[in-house]
Swiss-Prot record:
Protein name (database record): Matrix protein
Keyword set, alphabetical order: Host membrane, Host-virus interaction, Membrane, Phosphoprotein, Viral budding, Viral budding via the host ESCRT complexes, Viral envelope protein, Viral matrix protein, Viral release from host cell, Virion
Essential for glycoprotein binding: annotated span: 115-151
Further information: Most abundant protein in the virion.
Organism: Aravan virus (ARAV)
Gene: M
Length: 202
């Protein structure tokens, strides 16, 4: 029986591995940019529950025999049930996970590492989201382990409010990020004040 469970297993880099030949995507890589829902302050009509966050996210995948997004998606479909971080920021974490996994991984021994560092603008529905000035330091390992496959998913997300301005972003709505957000059941609703803006409900 396939069991999704939260356990701690170390995925250490192997020192005898050859140097990585794949580099990280450049900072301006469009694959890493958030969707139209998250736009700079100057483009947002309703600013009541808007927050600018400086975000650092890292997802490390440990799998001795490689991995497929089929298993990753299966793990993320249970994300609400295993998430151990601040519940007021679960929506932000889901967005960062989707964006990070849309980039290109950097191999580190037996691990594949996805990273994102961005200033993102979020809007939450009334009474939702983090408290003003609240910061997030979230770290968790979720492991899939059955008779045929092992995958360790190490997730780290840090987020703090900041005042750095951004630019208008867009992403293909059929992209991997949107697929992963759907898997994680990211909850949003269209803003009554701005038809181009979606509000996070979590």
């Amino acid at each position: 029986m396939n069991i999704l469970r939260k356990i701690v297993k170390s995925c250490k880099d192997e020192e005898d591995q050859k140097p990585a030949l794949v580099s990280a995507p450049p900072d301006d890589d469009d694959l890493w940019l958030p969707p139209p829902e998250y736009v700079p302050l100057t483009e947002i009509t309703g600013k009541k529950n808007m927050r600018n966050f400086c975000v650092n996210g890292e997802i490390k995948i440990c799998s001795p025999n490689g991995y497929s997004f089929r298993i990753l998606r299966h793990i993320l479909k249970s994300f609400d049930g295993v998430y151990s971080g601040n519940r007021r920021m679960i929506g932000l974490v889901k967005v960062v996970i989707g964006l990070a996994l849309s980039g290109a991984p950097v191999p580190e021994g037996m691990n594949w590492v996805y990273k994102i560092r961005r200033t993102l603008v979020f809007q939450w529905a009334e009474s939702r989201g983090p408290l003003d000035g609240e910061e997030l330091e979230y770290s968790q390992e979720i492991t899939w382990d059955d008779d045929s496959e092992f995958i360790g998913l190490q997730i780290r997300v840090s987020a703090r409010q900041c005042h750095i301005q951004g630019r208008v972003w867009c992403i293909n709505m059929n992209s991997r990020a949107c697929q992963l957000w759907s898997d994680m059941s990211l909850k949003t609703q269209q803003s009554d004040e701005d038809k181009n803006t979606s509000l996070l409900l979590e």
